[in-house]
Amino acid sequence: MKMKKYVSHRFLQLIPILLGITFLSFAMMRLAGSDVVTEMYQNRGTEVSQEIIDAKRAELGLDQPFLIQYGRWLGGMLTGDMGESYMTGKPVFPTFLSKLPATLLLTALSIILTILVSIPFGILAAVTHDKIPDLILRFFSFIGNALPNFFVAMLLMQLLSIRLQLLPVISDGVTLKSAWMPALTLAVSMSAKYMRQVRAAVLEEWNKDYVQGAWARGVRSRVILWKNVMKSSMLTIITLLALSIGNLLGGTAIIESIFMWDGVGKLAVDAITMRDYPVIQAYVVWMAIIYVLVNLITDLLYHRLDPRIRLGVTKG
């Protein structure tokens, strides 16, 4: 099977997955049992008659059978029309797009910080196995894994914002300076987890027969590490990065709320609180697309890096 055929086949597989996710999420929200129109007016602090509520429900199509509602929404989504927010009355798609720059900036900065910390220290812990550097790094990795993100956020606020006054506590807009605090908070836990995984992957490769054979032939340790061990360990690192990128692009609701970072995660939390179904549905679609694409890209990277997988594709 050629690579183009493989990619086309994977894309075709994604269509029923996305349709299934949108259908289930749409059904679950409709089965919640609450009257969206009544809550919408209550949240706005407006008292209206039952006639107005019924008219609004008909305007939004909420008086139609479930399948008709889903079909109308799906048809609109395919043309870029995700409806209007029940709470603000603004189009959902532009509102969602306006939050993406903040989420993309936070994702990129968090991933960069995580890579810069976890990979070098993970390698150092592996090559100094059971020695003092390894023990120290494993201790800090354990602490980083144990601390919840909101607690790390409070510690960083106290240290970097209140005492040292280096960074702002609350975001004053989508700027690089405001992104440092939430990005550092996310990077602490991710770096701790990644460092352990990188260490384990490097140690596993380091103890394999081909590495021992290279040692016996007099190949230098540095060459073995970077040319052989790290190349084989990249699959583990790519898997971890793919999962984290998916989570980060979906927004990190707690961290965004703590630092008032105006990203996708905060938008989703506000929508869930207000039962703003069109915005919630847009968020579900976004998350589904992100995870599907991230998994596809990860598979393609696997084929690129692992000759055994690539061989299986070409012969399939």
Question: Where is each model-derived feature located?
Answer:
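Membrane-water interface segments at transmembrane-helix boundaries in multipass membrane proteins
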Residues: 138-200
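Hydrophobic alpha-helical segments of integral membrane proteins
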Residues: 3, 11, 52, 56, ...
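An internal, D/E-rich "acidic patch" concept
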Residues: 62-119
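Alpha-helical transmembrane segments of integral membrane proteins
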Residues: 4, 96, 100-133, 174-316
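Residue-level signal for discrete positions within transmembrane alpha-helices
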Residues: 14, 99, 103, 139-142, ...
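Transmembrane helix irregularities
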Residues: 32, 144-147, 249
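Cytoplasmic-entry segments and transmembrane alpha-helices of multi-pass inner-membrane transporters
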Residues: 2-11, 120-156, 235
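Hydrophobic alpha-helical transmembrane segments of membrane transport/permease proteins
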Residues: 18-71, 165-181
